[in-house]
């Protein structure tokens, strides 16, 4: 391979210190790695859109009879199957294998019916196409290219009006060119295939890879983005867009998008994996499930916070406990017990006004809550409102006469109230 030729399959690895993509790697040294990358990239484009065999559309322009035969990677020895690699090396279908597309190398043991019909092609041309597929499958890319070229030339010379079959032939030959490192001819054949069948995924993906190998990053970016409009699940296109974006930012600066060619809008009819609009019932069911899941998570979080707060109270860490209870109330603002728990923390921290406020909130929810009355009485006591404290303690004893703490506090508060009244009278 001369230095002017582009490496048939690119490692797409950044060169040290340059940020540039290394596009020329010797096949004899890195053949295995290159083959793995190509299979990984093309193996993602496995499905065709409904109702076509990568064909359709207007007739193409005349081909190029007498196209030279390529001799880069034209035999199985130069393209050995890599263990564990995808069988869809060129983007062929792994299931329901079609003879419209060549299968990846490494499956030579499979039988191939060379006389199988191929669309509207007459038997001699169908046989050429099937032979090309078999040769490609065996890794003989140069020989496969010659068969596809003969089939293309035969279609043109015979005036066969079968754009579907001609599109696939161009796409298959483009796969050979890409395998053989001939990126320029790959681009040319992919463009012809796309003229026959616009927005055909495999020619777009192959052309994008060829553009990238030639460091024509803007055009590669456009083709990869078009591929993702057709089929969002093509991971190779996602990876390539991410990689090329970095290259374009380095090459063109922050305004790199303004220098891109226009990205075509793919019609809905050409898009794969499109999701149907969900029904109103389905949307409602989803919303209900989401709400239930949200409530479940909130309840679990509430329980954890409450337990953490209780543990902190046991360890006399009242500031931390009050914060945990505050988080609880953010989740469930109508939980009476949390207000009384936080009121206890505020009492210990001598934040009497806040303690009283929490007890007020608790009593609004539970008007006969003994803890709320008792702790509010202590808050009143801390605020030196002995009369209100006495009133709340009497409420506690009316609800439960056996609360000894309330009796003791009532006696203490009564004495404080008496002393306060005497002091005021003397003053």
UniProtKB/Swiss-Prot annotation:
Disruption phenotype: Morpholino knockdown of the protein causes increase incidence of dorsal curvature and hydrocephalus. It comes from the Eukaryota. It is found in: Cytoplasm; Dynein axonemal particle. Pfam families: TPR_1, TPR_8. GO terms for biological process: axonemal dynein complex assembly. Gene3D superfamilies: Tetratricopeptide repeat domain (1.25.40.10). The keyword Nucleus does not apply. SMART domains: TPR. Coiled coil: none annotated. GO terms for cellular component: cytoplasm; cytosol; dynein axonemal particle. Residues 46-113 are annotated as: Disordered. TPR repeats lie at residues 125-158, 167-200, 202-234, 302-335, 336-369, 371-403. Keywords: Cytoplasm, Repeat, TPR repeat. PANTHER family: RNA (RNA) POLYMERASE II ASSOCIATED PROTEIN HOMOLOG, SPERM-ASSOCIATED ANTIGEN 1. May play a role in the cytoplasmic assembly and/or trafficking of the axonemal dynein arms. This is Sperm-associated antigen 1A. It comes from Danio rerio.
